[in-house]
Amino acid sequence: MSNVNTLSALAKSGALSGKRVFIRADLNVPFDDAGRISEDTRIRASVPGIRLALDAGEAVMVTSHLGRPKEGALTEADSLAPVAQRLSELLGMQVRLVPDWVDGVSVEPGEVVLLENCRGNVGEKKDDEGLSRKMAALCDVYVNDAFGTAHRAEATTHGIARFAPVACAGPLLEAELEALGRALHDPKRPLVAIVGGSKVSTKLSILQSLADKVDQLVVGGGIANTFMLAAGLPIGKSLAEPEQVEQARAVIEIMKRRGAEVPIPTDVVCAKSFGADAAATVKAAADVAEDDMILDIGPQTAQRLADILKAAGTIVWNGPVGVFEFDQFAHGTEVVARAIADSAGFSIAGGGDTLAAIAKYGIADQTGYISTGGGAFLEFLEGKALPAVAVLQARAA
């Protein structure tokens, strides 16, 4: 799908031996109050790309951003030092942290060094050409293995790729592009998308883009409440955006004209207040009272969605369908999650809340592909070009 050069193809060809490789990874991991890494999925995900380069006989430089430091003024809290330590453990070899690296790095074939937080460099976020050229001069091969930042044009994700002698995608980025392409460019039908979240306004362009492509567009959370309003149903004091009703109607209309559908809930789970101890009541969608808040889809709607998902050829999942953090409002999301797990179709899931739901119901192994990119995943769904991918495509052309 993505017609880019790949690290795996270069490694196979034997063209990398003795070369200097610069890998832009996504090692932006969370820390606990004691300054320890609390969740290391992203670091573990970067290991195959680093190993591939090492096994091909390269001298390996790796960098990433961490948090949002002030350019030119890194503090101890912004340092990748704990990441270097964790990477050393995972690779079974010492990974040296290099602080000031833009003007030159000494690294030998078979060695891995971690270049300090790239967002500390002045000009990184602006994709500065001078900085990009300096970084490109450090390497023979540039590898982007950070899908999570593919929607940003920064010096380490975009600029350097313009000037490095060779620019390619690492295995993580390659797998991500393949999965997304399989889901949206050449999907097995029926294609079903689930878009949850609180606001139509933040996901409107995604809803509009998907309305042209999918066979069923399932909406959840506050977004579903706005669509219920658009369908003339009462929603009480539920979270919704009345000013987006016309847009919601337009999406329903586009789908209808194509013979596709936005399944509107027929029953819902309501409460009089929002909280872990709120009492849940199941009601028909038409019977929602003025003081009710809709916090989940009802069992009848959940079953209908499960039937749609089980028959799907391809599923794109972004967002829960209810307030699944509270168990009494989690049934809808659980039914949807288990239906995706049981579906024979190919599924791709992305976004923080979605990943939390996958973890809660233990269905990671039954989900076709779990996207590592939040913002990048959403922009891909919108049909936008991702700058970091576009530059690799241009270099491969």
Curated annotation (Swiss-Prot):
Q: Note whether Transferase occurs among the keywords.
A: yes
Q: Where does ATP bind?
A: K203, E325, G351, G352, D353, T354
| Protein keywords | ATP-binding, Cytoplasm, Glycolysis, Kinase, Nucleotide-binding, Transferase
Query: Mind naming one GO cellular-component term on file for this protein?
Result: cytosol
Q: Does the keyword Kinase apply?
A: yes
Instruction: Give the pathway listed in the UniProt entry for this protein.
Output: Carbohydrate degradation; glycolysis; pyruvate from D-glyceraldehyde 3-phosphate: step 2/5
What is the annotated localization of this protein?
A: Cytoplasm
GO term, biological process aspect, one: gluconeogenesis
| Short name of one Pfam family | PGK
Predominant location category? cytoplasm
> Which reaction is this enzyme known to catalyze?
(2R)-3-phosphoglycerate + ATP = (2R)-3-phospho-glyceroyl phosphate + ADP
An example of a GO molecular function for this protein is:
phosphoglycerate kinase activity
Enzyme class, UniProt record, top EC level? transferase
What EC number(s) does its UniProt record assign? 2.7.2.3
Q: Which residues bind substrate?
A: D26, L27, N28, R42, H65, L66, G67, R68, R119, R152
Q: Which domain of life is it from?
A: Bacteria
Similarity annotation: Belongs to the phosphoglycerate kinase family.
Quaternary structure and interacting proteins, as annotated:
Monomer.
HAMAP family referenced in this protein's UniProt entry, alphabetically: Phosphoglyc_kinase
Protein name from the UniProt record: Phosphoglycerate kinase
What is the source species? Bordetella parapertussis (strain 12822 / ATCC BAA-587 / NCTC 13253)
